[in-house]
Amino acid sequence: MLFNLKNLYRITKLTQNSKHLPRHFCRGPPNQMNVCLKGRDLLTLQNYTADELKYLLWVASDLKQRIKDKGEYLPLMQGKSLAMIFEKRSTRTRLSAETGFALLGGHSSFLTKQDIHLGTNESLTDTARVLSSMTNAILARVYKHNDLDLMTKEATIPVINGLSDLYHPLQILADYLTLQEHYGGLNGLTIAWIGDGNNVLHSIMTSAAKLGMHLRIATPKGFEPDLRITKVTEQYSKEYGTRLLLTTDPLEAANGANVLVTDTWISMGQEEEKRRRLKAFQGYQITMQTVQSAASNWTFLHCLPRKPEEVDDEVFYSPRSLVFQEAENRKWTIMAVMVSLLTDYSPQLQMPTF
């Protein structure tokens, strides 16, 4: 058959609340994992299975090796266009999308809140329908995740979450690719999150267990992750046999961890809370004292931009810090997402160990 019936059923199930039929069917040769993502949205990693996450990372690794290391030209996006709607400022998400899409032969159009006001000058419904008629995919960075949900119901093309108040899936795919490259695999690693219970953490929580990673989370009281997401994470931990710890003690979270992760304490839109947040997060800076509690092979990740109060220079610029490899991998993982959602591409290189 031209496509896997199981995948067709799953795609139909995911879109059953939409008036639209499944957008595409995979017509290419089956890949080693028998995964088809063409036509899917990417709003949260919660909607992706373990095999689907591994497939995205495999495609990212494949594209990186073929294009960067071997110098191949792969015009997989030739004739395709990407609409980029950004309500918030961005460096890495915008650059990785624009340069990655161009590297694959496609064209991107960048629209800021000065160009388009979601739900203000024009309804989300109308915006999604217009963009669907002119482009092949939408990458949106928004304040409210609900806007993405509505957009996916009205769009007939894939919608990709470039960051919302709830999730940042593209960042976490880059983190996982970076860790896979460094450690040679992900299964069995312990991630320690020390900081705010924010969108980046939520994306880790909804995916780490699927890849066999344990999670230790330290947040100040009042800054815990969303309770709904915590419940899902607890369920995943039981289902996949991983360990989960939630605490207010940074050193307890760091104990035995392979990967130490933090992020900004003051996200975009929270500037008025700066004084209160800086006070609440005292003692949460990652320092060499923190890493003494970690595993001997510890590494450090930060999605950037970084402030010194979040992590000191000694850790941030140490050989154990993978932040700049992590930043580069934003490009390869977003390219993998676009290729997977828009084409029938099958990786040519051997699947990495996960």
From Swiss-Prot:
It is found in: Mitochondrion matrix. It is an enzyme of class 2 (transferase). Residues 1-32 form a transit peptide. The keyword Amino-acid biosynthesis applies. Carbamoyl phosphate binds at residues 90-94, 141, 168, 330. One of its GO terms (cellular component) is mitochondrial matrix. GO terms for biological process: arginine biosynthetic process via ornithine; citrulline biosynthetic process; L-arginine biosynthetic process; urea cycle. Optimum pH is 7.5 in the presence of 5 mM ornithine. The curve shifts toward a more alkaline region with a decrease in ornithine concentration. Induction: By diet of egg yolk in animals which have a high level of OTC activity due to presence of OCB gene. Its EC number is 2.1.3.3. Pathway: Nitrogen metabolism; urea cycle; L-citrulline from L-ornithine and carbamoyl phosphate: step 1/1. L-ornithine binds at residues 141, 199, 263-267, 302-305, 330. One of its GO terms (molecular function) is amino acid binding. Keywords: Amino-acid biosynthesis, Arginine biosynthesis, Mitochondrion, Transferase, Transit peptide, Urea cycle. Catalyzes the second step of the urea cycle, the condensation of carbamoyl phosphate with L-ornithine to form L-citrulline. The urea cycle ensures the detoxification of ammonia by converting it to urea for excretion. Ornithine transcarbamylase activity varies within and between different breeds of chicken. Homotrimer. This is Ornithine transcarbamylase, mitochondrial. It comes from Gallus gallus (Chicken).
